[in-house]
C-alpha cells in the first residue's frame, strides 16, 4: 500500500511529533516569560516583548524561519572563525525547534497574558490574606485558574505549530513531509503520497483535539456552565 516506504514514513512521522512537542515546550516557556514581562511594572522588559510580539506577528512564518536559521548559522560561523575552529553546521532538528519555539512563543505570550488578566483579582487577594507566598499563589491559584482561560488559545497554537512543522522540511529535516516527498518521487506517485502526508497530519490533529478536550474538562472542574 505504501510501496515499501512505510518504515521511512513512520520514522518521518515520529520526527514530526518530536519536533512539534519540543517546539511547543520552548514556545510555552517563552510565552510565560513574555506574559510576565508584559504584565510587570518593568517598562524596559515590557517594551522588549511588545516589540518581539509585534515583529513576529507582522512577518510571515516562512520568512522568519529562514532568517532565524541562516542568521544562526552565520553567527555560529563568525564565532568558529574567530576561534579558529572548524565550521559547525546546525542540526535541522535543533534549528527547527529554535525557530518554531521563537516564532510561536510570541503567540503564547499573548495567550498567557490574556489568561492571566482574566483571573479574578479576588482570588489573588484571598491567597494573600491566607498568607500564601508569591510562589504558592502562582502555583496553587493563578496557574490553575489561568489555564482554564488559556487552554483554547493553547490548543489553537498547538495545532498551528503542528502544521507549521511541514515548513521545517525546507531546512533539510527528514520529517514526514520529506519522507512522503521521497516516496512520491521514487514511485512516480507524488499525489498519492501527498494525500498520505495529509492524512497523517489529520490523525495528529484529531488525536490532539481529544487530548485538549480532556484537559479543558480537567481545568473546568467546579465551574458551572451556562445552560442554553
UniProtKB/Swiss-Prot annotation:
Protein's membrane topology: Multi-pass membrane protein
Identify the InterPro entries for this entry: AA_ABC_transptr_permease_3TM (IPR010065), ABC_transp_permease_HisMQ (IPR051613), MetI-like (IPR000515), MetI-like_sf (IPR035906)
For this chain, one GO molecular function annotation is: transmembrane transporter activity
Per UniProt, subcellular location reads as: Cell inner membrane
Q: Does the keyword Ubl conjugation apply?
A: no
Instruction: Outline which residue ranges sit on the Cytoplasmic face.
Output: 34-58, 109-152, 216-228
* Keyword terms: Amino-acid transport, Cell inner membrane, Cell membrane, Membrane, Transmembrane, Transmembrane helix, Transport
User: In what residue span(s) does the ABC transmembrane type-1 domain sit?
Assistant: 13-212
Tell me which Gene3D superfamilies the record gives.
Answer: MetI-like
Name it.
Histidine/lysine/arginine/ornithine transport system permease protein HisQ
Q: Which organism is it from?
A: Salmonella typhimurium (strain LT2 / SGSC1412 / ATCC 700720)
- Which lineage do the record's taxonomy fields give for this organism? Bacteria, Pseudomonadati, Pseudomonadota, Gammaproteobacteria, Enterobacterales
Amino acid at each position: 500500500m505504501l510501496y515499501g516506504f512505510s518504515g521511512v514514513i513512520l520514522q518521518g512521522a515520529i520526527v514530526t511529533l518530536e519536533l512539534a512537542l519540543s517546539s511547543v515546550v520552548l514556545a510555552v516557556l517563552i510565552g510565560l516569560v513574555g506574559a510576565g514581562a508584559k504584565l510587570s511594572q518593568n517598562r524596559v522588559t515590557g517594551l522588549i516583548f511588545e516589540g518581539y510580539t509585534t515583529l513576529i506577528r507582522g512577518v510571515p512564518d516562512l520568512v522568519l524561519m529562514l532568517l532565524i536559521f541562516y542568521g544562526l548559522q552565520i553567527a555560529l560561523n563568525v564565532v568558529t572563525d574567530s576561534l579558529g575552529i572548524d565550521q559547525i553546521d546546525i542540526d535541522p532538528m535543533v534549528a527547527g525547534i529554535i525557530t518554531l519555539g521563537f516564532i510561536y512563543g510570541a503567540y503564547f505570550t499573548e495567550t498567557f497574558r490574556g489568561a492571566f488578566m482574566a483571573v479574578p483579582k479576588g482570588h489573588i487577594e484571598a491567597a494573600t490574606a491566607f498568607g500564601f507566598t508569591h510562589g504558592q499563589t502562582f502555583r496553587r491559584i493563578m496557574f490553575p485558574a489561568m489555564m482554564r482561560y488559556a487552554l483554547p488559545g493553547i490548543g489553537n497554537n498547538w495545532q498551528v505549530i503542528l502544521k507549521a512543522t511541514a515548513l521545517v522540511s525546507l531546512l533539510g529535516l527528514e520529517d514526514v513531509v520529506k519522507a512522503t516527498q521521497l516516496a512520491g518521487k521514487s514511485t512516480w506517485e507524488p499525489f498519492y503520497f501527498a494525500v498520505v502526508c495529509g492524512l497523517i497530519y489529520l490523525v495528529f490533529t484529531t488525536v490532539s483535539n481529544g487530548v485538549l478536550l480532556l484537559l479543558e474538562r480537567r481545568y473546568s472542574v467546579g465551574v458551572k456552565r451556562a445552560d442554553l
